Amino acid sequence: SPSKAKTLNKYLGKDYEVLASYGHVRNLLSKSQGINTENFKMRYELIDRNKKHIDAIIKAVKKSDEILLATDPDREGEAIAWHLAEILNEKNLIKNKSIRRVVFQEITKSAIIEAIQNPRDIAIPLVYAQQSRQALDYLIGFNLSPLLWKKIRYGLSAGRVQSPALRLIVEREIEIEKFDSKEYW
């Protein structure tokens, strides 16, 4: 976020240029083009509203020797770091440059310095976890909901979390309705 970038710039000084990615930088292609269901290969496109931020990052990377990706320390942040690295790699901007991941749990000067002194590679298992979540959302929710609109009623929705949760609620309600209360002494 821009406010985090500003704080990091303050802590790190003029030897570093900190830029915000403004969250996710790429999305799956729209409609049925985002995931090939034969091999589950995912296809991405740059999010339009983030193009200017990516352009600023590209400009800064051209002047730098080292790239540190400091996105959030969760699977979504890891995926954002991976997407940034992929974009830079596609533009041949990381050849002969170090690109590393820095992770911190708090925005304090000591935590930031500690993270920069101990960079790591992008955690691909976390990236895969985020991609799996995104693929399931796409394949189940984005595709099943329109089918429900056509076959049952417009406005209905389905999703990877919502559908099983709804089933649990319905099953519990059926148990409650079937319950036969009896007095015991």
Question: What are these regions, as identified by a protein language model?
Answer:
Residues K62, I107-W185:
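C-terminal or mid-to-C-terminal helical accessory/interaction module adjacent to the motor/catalytic core
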Residues P2-Q134, L148:
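Intrinsically disordered, low-complexity regulatory segments
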